[in-house]
């Protein structure tokens, strides 16, 4: 009732798990070495987010929505949310243009929180989570944007507790009339540039999880990968500018926290946070941050080798778990079986402790 009173004339609908229970039996399960099966946390979270979007993605709601805003269990203010939605990367006509834009969430007034889903323009994870948050690897574009005081810091992905998307990515009939051919991007003066996926994601997009048993990628990160595999909408006007990047931004002026005390003190921390800059760079250097990620440069369809610890003996449950692991390897959105036949590598031997296995990169692919 209080919500209705404060939002007169605004259409609203609440999707609650108590009314529409998620069927856990439909979710992908992994088998642990003990033989016990578990639902992967990220797959569950992806399903929850898809459930919230279902009225839009299913076509049940016929109205067209310009923006979709996700909020975690955070303390925020309306001014910040409005700034994120309508005041980020504003074009000459005064309209905000982005594929996605996130705020910045903090676990304390000075410590950045979202290290899991945040990646800079070249796919590096962040450095020490104090201002300016990003590390100095590669071209350091994201770090430079923060230091330049931009409200549209170019990134590869982020979430930050509050994130807004171009609503067309989640609406069923939009693609037929508003998408155009994706522009070609050439890698220039850098050995650390991602290639755009050759397989285009279909609209409406849905959140998903990484199907491998013992590797997780955040659903908040994978949704950005799928956005990047989607052609640009034809009415973007700033996507030819260098400042556009991939069209995914962080707005560091929009900040949220997970408790009221931290939110209260953020305004004070912002006054002196630039003093952290040299110290953050020094700590990044000696702590070797961002950490090395052997998957950062993988492209869809690449064949790569993983190393897997194999004990000298197996219980029947462990043996079955290993069989299931190899059988399901290749993922929910692809199949590595053809590659395995072409290159028999890492055949398991009871006398070996470490073996290899082959997989096909499918992290951007969709069914």
Predicted regions and their residues:
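Active-site-proximal specificity loops/subdomain of glycosyltransferases
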Residues: 2-66, 71
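Alpha-helix termini
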Residues: 7, 55-64, 87-96, 229-243
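A short acidic, often aromatic-flanked loop/helix-cap motif at beta-alpha or helix-coil junctions
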Residues: 19-27, 108-111, 256-258
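Intrinsic disorder
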Residues: 35-47, 149-152, 156-159, 211-218, ...
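Conserved catalytic core of nucleotide-sugar-dependent glycosyltransferases
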Residues: 40, 73-204, 273-321, 325, ...
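Generic preference for well-ordered alpha-helical elements
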Residues: 42-49, 65, 78-81, 167, ...
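Terminal low-complexity segments of carbohydrate-biosynthetic enzymes
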Residues: 192-194, 199, 205-221, 225-367
């Amino acid at each position: 009732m209080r919500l209705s009173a404060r939002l007169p004339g605004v259409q609203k609908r609440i999707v609650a798990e108590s009314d529409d229970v998620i069927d856990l039996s439909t979710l992908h399960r992994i088998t642990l070495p003990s033989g016990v099966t578990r639902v992967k946390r990220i797959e569950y979270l992806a399903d929850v987010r898809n459930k919230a979007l279902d009225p839009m993605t299913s076509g049940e709601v016929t109205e067209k929505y310009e923006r979709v805003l996700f909020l975690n269990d955070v303390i925020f203010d309306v001014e910040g949310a409005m700034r994120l939605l309508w005041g980020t990367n504003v074009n000459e006509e005064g309209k905000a243009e982005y594929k996605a834009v996130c705020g910045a969430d903090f676990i304390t007034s000075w410590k950045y929180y979202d290290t899991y889903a945040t990646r800079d323009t070249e796919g590096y994870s962040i450095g020490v989570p104090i201002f300016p948050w990003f590390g100095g690897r590669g071209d350091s574009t994201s770090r430079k944007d923060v230091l330049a005081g931009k409200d549209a810091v170019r990134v590869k992905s982020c979430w930050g507790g509050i994130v807004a998307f171009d609503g067309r990515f989640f609406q069923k009939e939009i693609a037929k009339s508003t998408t155009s051919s994706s522009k070609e991007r050439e890698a220039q003066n850098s050995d650390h540039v991602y290639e755009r996926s050759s397989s285009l994601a279909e609209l409406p997009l849905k959140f998903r999880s990484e199907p491998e048993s013992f590797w997780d990628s955040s659903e908040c990160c994978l949704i950005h990968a799928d956005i990047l595999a989607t052609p640009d909408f034809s009415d973007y006007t700033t996507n030819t500018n260098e400042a556009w990047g991939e069209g995914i931004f962080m707005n560091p002026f929009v900040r949220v926290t997970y408790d009221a005390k931290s939110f209260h003190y953020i305004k004070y921390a912002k006054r002196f946070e630039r003093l952290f800059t040299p110290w953050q760079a020094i700590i990044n250097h000696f702590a070797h941050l961002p950490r090395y990620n052997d998957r950062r440069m993988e492209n869809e369809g690449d064949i790569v080798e993983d190393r897997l610890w194999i004990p000298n003996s197996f219980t029947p449950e462990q043996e079955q778990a290993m069989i299931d692991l190899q059988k399901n390897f290749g993922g929910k959105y692809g199949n590595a079986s053809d590659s395995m036949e072409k290159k028999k590598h890492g055949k398991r031997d009871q006398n070996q402790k470490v073996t290899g296995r082959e997989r096909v990169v499918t992290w951007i692919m969709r069914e």
